Structure formats: C-alpha cells, structure tokens
C-alpha cells in the first residue's frame, strides 16, 4: 500500500506492507537515530514525534501515519544538540545507545511542561531504559538545561 506523510519536515511517500511498523519504515528512510531495543514498547529507544506527540514507533503501524507528520531526532538537530550538551556535561551519555530516545522524550517534556519539578521529570522519563547509568546524570542535565533556558529567556 502507498502512504504519504511528512518525515522531518519533508513530504514523503512510501510503499509499505500492511504489517510494517513505523520503526522499520523510518529506519529504512535513513533515520538511524530511531533504535530498536525491546520490540515491546518498554524501553523508549524508538521514540518519535507523531503530529508533535511522542509515540513508541515499535508499536505503531506505518499505515497509521498516512497524511500525518513524523519527526525523528534527525529533524530536531539544533534543538537536540543544545540539550544534548547538558547531558554530556553531566557524564550521562555513557555508551550513547539510549540517548536518541531519551532526548526525544526530554524534548517532549520541555514542550508539554516548560517548568517541570523533579518528580514530573522522573515520571515523564520513566519509560526510558538505560543499562549504563543510574539516571542521576540525565536528571541533572535536564535540570541544568532548564535553568539555563530560563535564565536565557529572562535575559531577553
């Protein structure tokens, strides 16, 4: 079946089988930041934005994106690089395999709750599994990024 959608701000068409998963489609189109970690919608590595909302692409049929907008980390490079520097500064990147999904969910958090407290941050990111870190570095990175962003906005 033929589908038409927007991928990272570009109109895209693809021929897919009815059982094709979104993760497989976006990876076949060159979006390698979308990782497959569990195939059970439990790890957060496959997070993408579907119409600006985070979804786990391993649990979404590609046919459901027809006429919609999909954004991966490749489509958010400037925003992701700005935030990613704060994660790296806290030594929270470790092996880096989980970073794309973690960054996508953190960016979704910032959009939904511009000034979250620590509990809201932990709750929002609970679906991201990282086998290398204790999550404290990620939490500090988020808090430092939010403080920097707030001071930047205040200065303007």
Language-model segment annotations:
Residues 1-156:
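Signature of N-terminal electron-transfer/Fe-S-associated modules in redox systems
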């Amino acid at each position: 079946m033929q589908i038409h959608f927007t991928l990272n701000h570009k109109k895209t068409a693809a021929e897919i089988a009815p059982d094709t998963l979104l993760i497989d489609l976006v990876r076949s189109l060159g979006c390698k930041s979308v990782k497959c970690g569990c195939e059970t919608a439990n790890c957060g590595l496959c997070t993408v934005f579907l119409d600006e909302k985070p979804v786990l692409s391993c649990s979404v049929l590609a046919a459901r994106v027809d006429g919609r907008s999909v954004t991966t980390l490749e489509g958010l490079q400037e925003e992701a690089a700005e935030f990613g520097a704060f994660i790296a500064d806290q030594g929270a990147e470790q092996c880096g395999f989980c970073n794309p999904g973690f960054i996508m969910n953190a960016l979704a958090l910032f959009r939904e709750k511009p000034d979250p407290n620590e509990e809201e941050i932990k709750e929002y990111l609970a679906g991201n599994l990282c086998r290398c870190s204790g999550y404290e570095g990620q939490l500090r990175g988020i808090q430092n990024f939010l403080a920097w962003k707030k001071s930047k906005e205040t200065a303007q």
